[in-house]
Amino acid sequence: MRVSCVYATASRWGGPPVASEVRGDAAISTTPDAAPGLAARRRRILFVAEAVTLAHVVRPFALAQSLDPSRYEVHFACDPRYNQLLGPLPFRHHAIHTIPSERFFGNLTQGRFYAMRTLRKYVEADLRVLDEIAPDLVVGDLRISLSVSARLAGIPYIAIANAYWSPYAQRRFPLPDVIWTRLFGVRLVKLLYRLERPLLFALQCMPLNWVRRRHGLSSLGWNLCRIFTDGDHTLYADVPELMPTYDLPANHEYLGPVLWSPAGKPPTWWDSLPTDRPIVYATLGTSGGRNLLQLVLNALAELPVTVIAATAGRSDLKTVPANAFVADYLPGEAAAARSAVVVCNGGSLTTQQALVAGVPVIGVAGNLDQHLNMEAVERAGAGVLLRTERLKSQRVAGAVMQVISRSEYRQAAARLADAFGRDRVGFPQHVENALRLMPENRPRTWLAS
């Protein structure tokens, strides 16, 4: 089974989540997949998503859907801000708090991630959910507090991450869009960043290390990559052909791309698009700048292309050019597959949708995660990286025409599509492997504290 093709179940956009009965013993499921004779024998798996962006919710959501409900009792914990987009949940949902996305992005522009106070509250919330559900295994995506809470609860923990955050990755750290690049320009700040980056990363490691020490756990050191990838097992939602690593330990493995698209009816214009011009799929996702989509649409307005755009519910467009067709959300995999080029924020969710279809990408990258991903795509020859600071329409238009007119971009994207499509160990097997290594009588150390 390949996790590289995980699809959303059929649902209506905006559908309500399935009601669930949450009990501490969690022995009998209230979801339709439950069978009375199977519940006691099924392994209980808890997925925990950090809902600062949609990508970190839909990845564990898609992985949770890949598990056989006759073998696993699945629980899904996340802030409910994206629940309407997910539609009816086929497993139990547990609401936990995630800081507002705007605060998270504001932190990133100031060169920091989470405050110690935030992580302490996260750990407390995690422990309540872990105690309530008593899972056999927990799977987290960017919920770095699980580095503490899962260990205190004695529960095996699988961390989902991108390979460019691996301590074993072969990459450099580019300068992201931060407040200083907007004030002083990229060139000057880049020189200082090369000197100060190790110190900045060390400062960003301090909050989690403080919380770990407070609970009697050892420090993870001053490598930010260890903060984002710490787990009993770490799975990279990437392929080595795009993001190579070296000397991976046995508990770090490639999972392959995890794809997701919102289910539901496409917009009315979906089946009547013009066919005489190349299609450009534009979406800045939930972590792109609110005004960037308008800039992109304006940049493409005079080009001989048809634009299909998804606002992700975040953009208040003042004008929609005549060659553009816009919706809040689109089926991303299908939109990418019918396009000549995809313009996005450079995040892994949309770039993987494009590359799986063999379509090159233009990434308008802002934060470090997006820059790391797009540098890998650009290095592979399958796309172009644009910076968000002082972005001009002419630069966007030039990049689009460059990618459309030069066949080497599509050829490179096709090579990556082949890599993404190769068979590899599927997520259910990784779950089985983690459970097999689980001690029979794991200690619940935090209960005594």
Curated annotation (Swiss-Prot):
Anything else known: Was identified as a high-confidence drug target.
Protein name according to UniProt: PGL/p-HBAD biosynthesis rhamnosyltransferase
Entry superkingdom: Bacteria
Assigned GO CC terms: plasma membrane
EC number: 2.4.1.-
One biological process term in Gene Ontology: glycolipid biosynthetic process
Keyword Glycosyltransferase: yes
Record keywords: Glycosyltransferase, Transferase
Natural source organism: Mycobacterium tuberculosis (strain ATCC 25618 / H37Rv)
Pfam assignment, any one: EryCIII-like_C
Function: Catalyzes the transfer of the first rhamnosyl residue on p-hydroxybenzoic acid or phenolphthiocerol derivatives to form, after O-methylation at position 2 of the sugar unit, mono-O-methyl-glycosyl-p-hydroxybenzoic acid derivative (p-HBAD I) and 2-O-methyl-rhamnosyl-phenolphthiocerol dimycocerosate (also called mycoside B) during p-hydroxybenzoic acid derivatives (p-HBAD) and glycosylated phenolphthiocerol dimycocerosates (PGL) biosynthesis.
Alphabetical list of SUPFAM superfamilies matching this protein: UDP-Glycosyltransferase/glycogen phosphorylase (SSF53756)
GO MF annotations, alphabetized: hexosyltransferase activity; UDP-glycosyltransferase activity
